[in-house]
């Protein structure tokens, strides 16, 4: 499974986060956990756009694309509109993207 993640917006818009994650490269436990999060969120059945409060201009917007075999789906979701079922995956991908950014700045790799 390939997951592409991007977080835009927020108070400091230049702190965009991006991540490309191939779950086949992860340790088995982490791979299962992330793939289970995708499945339990109903990701492939979510609408392509979930809009939040238009007044929340400083809110984050997340773009997540999941490719799994011959299936591919992209969801763009405002922070205020993230369904409860999707929030664990968004949190995990955000943390992973932050780890990757830190590793890139120090020349290390993320396990």
What is the predicted function of each stretch?
Residues 1-111:
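Function-determining sites in protein domains
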């Amino acid at each position: 499974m390939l997951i592409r993640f991007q977080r835009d917006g927020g108070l400091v818009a230049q702190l965009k986060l991006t991540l490309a994650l191939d779950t086949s490269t992860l340790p088995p436990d982490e791979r299962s956990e992330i793939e289970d999060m995708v499945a339990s969120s109903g990701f492939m059945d979510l609408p392509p756009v979930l809009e939040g409060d238009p007044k929340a201009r400083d809110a984050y917007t997340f773009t997540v694309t999941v490719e799994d075999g011959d299936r591919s789906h992209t969801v763009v979701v405002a922070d205020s509109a993230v369904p409860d079922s999707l929030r664990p995956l968004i949190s995990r991908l955000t943390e992973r993207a932050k780890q990757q950014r830190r590793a890139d700045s120090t020349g290390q790799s993320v396990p």
